[in-house]
Design a protein with these regions (language model features):
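N-terminal auxiliary segments of SAM/dcSAM-dependent transferases
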Residues: 1-16
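Short alpha-helical patches at coil-to-helix transitions and adjacent helical residues
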Residues: 45, 49-52, 77
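Conserved alpha-helix/loop element of class I SAM-dependent methyltransferases that forms part
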Residues: 50-61
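S-adenosylmethionine/decaboxylated-SAM
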Residues: 12-43, 60, 64-242
Length: 242
């Protein structure tokens, strides 16, 4: 064996072992062959992932944090995280923030009234601890993993507090998946001033009959001066701050 190749061979073996441990850790959590995701994943889930990939492509040269409002199970947040690590694996300055009560809707406003009667506690998802573990597993495999912070509690209270304690924060992508009026309006009110030209606001339930509150909040805070666009015929819509 050529001794000049030994460091490269050792590096390759170490990388393969790291990948093996990474996949094994995920399979222990999920108890499935996670590498075979295309066999089991519904096409709409692939569509949503690719839509988030397109969003992350758009902000590659825009500095600032990625903020998801309404984490729920964490699928959306980790999709954005994965897309970042695919597109910018060595860029460690991108911070990720995920907000959720993890106890469902805090309150329901009159602007949320639709043909469905939403109530306090709807969409509760006790995923906080599991999600922290998954973030750690994925981050350990990344070359330069960005900081990912879960913010637990009512956005109306947690967001102003976080911004007061972290005055450096600017936002490159704000992904709104809160569904209802008040927290969506709060998020836009506090974060739009933190968004430079070229930054993106994305909506998960814009123009949805079941969730009128999100659209009402968007129109109140953004007006009609922005051009809303759809991504890949999915439920995800966005506008670019100009």
């Amino acid at each position: 064996m050529d001794s000049c190749n030994e460091p490269a061979i050792l590096f390759h073996k170490t990388l393969n072992k790291k990948l093996e441990n990474y996949v094994h850790s995920l399979q222990e959590i999920q108890n499935k062959h996670v590498s075979d995701f295309a066999l089991y994943t519904p096409i709409n889930s692939v569509q949503s992932f690719l839509a988030r990939y397109e969003l992350m492509k758009m902000i590659q040269d825009i500095p600032g944090a990625v903020v998801e409002m309404g984490v729920c199970s964490g699928n959306g947040l980790l999709s954005l995280f994965h897309c970042h690590n695919i597109l910018q694996p060595t860029y460690k300055y991108r911070e990720f923030y995920g907000f959720d009560t993890f106890e469902g809707f805090p309150e329901v406003h009159k602007n949320d009234i639709s043909h469905i009667k939403w109530e306090k506690g709807d969409f509760a998802n006790d995923s906080y601890d599991k999600l922290l573990n998954l973030i750690s597993v994925h981050s350990n495999y990344c070359y330069a993993a960005p900081n990912v912070k879960l913010v637990k509690g009512d956005v109306n209270e947690t967001l102003p507090k976080l911004l007061e304690e972290n005055k450096h924060i600017i936002v490159s992508l704000l992904y709104l998946d809160l569904d209802i009026y008040e927290p969506t309006k709060t998020a836009l009110h506090y974060l739009l001033p933190k968004m430079a030209k070229g930054s993106i606001v994305a909506f998960d339930e814009l123009n949805w009959k079941s969730f009128p509150g999100e659209t009402i909040a968007a129109l109140e805070e953004l007006g009609t001066k922005y051009k809303f666009k759809n991504l890949l015929n999915s439920g995800i819509n966005y506008c670019v701050i100009e």
